[in-house]
């Protein structure tokens, strides 16, 4: 079943325990051309996914360069229920953390099935709407958090967090939903599950990771034409030109930090990235670096394509 959320298309699939070859449930996404966000709420409002289901969803996102929005355990009724030793680590054990983010608490909104009665719901769908709106208005590189990240359609939250409660959760990599006077419910955090202070990961922030995923997917698809081209210096120069143009357009849109293109990004594809051994194996390697808007050193991503194949 498909639903529309703003300008975005949303596919709704049952979470199935079927095997991957059956292409049922979440495995149906193997046939999807492209998706960017994944929500896997439990079947029942008060239900909870198994850890295996969370791991499957996160692994799916890693394979497809997508991002998984994780719901909190419904038993977490106050901030003190969420500590590294008190359930959080077990809750996300084995989950690929860099492509996922956890949001707390649950949201309160009208249940159309119950005639509009206000009930508690997992927040993943509401957060996905905020992220999609932020992508449309500011780009994938903009943090989907802050006063502009209002959660439309939500009446309230199950827990009203204070600044003092927000801080420790943020340090654990848990993104808080907050309620502010005159603003209402908002997303007030933009860290991945790899964003705990103790981890010091380069993928600490949601917009940095999602920008990298966007670049990887766009450049992988945008350079597939090289497969039947001679794998030599003219091809590498053409790749640098095309990828450089793509990166420059993003720079002009404000995707990167830096006053000049040199400060904002680089593209490398030459005899250093693609050795003679790579050429012999039919591979071309592209290295891209970019300066994210969050203060950090250049983030490096690598794209590998098959090249130099003679068309039969």
Where are these regions (language model features)?
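Structured, hydrophobic secondary-structure cores that serve as assembly/anchoring elements
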Residues: 24-312
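Long, low-complexity, polar/charged, intrinsically disordered or flexibly structured peripheral segments
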Residues: 1-22
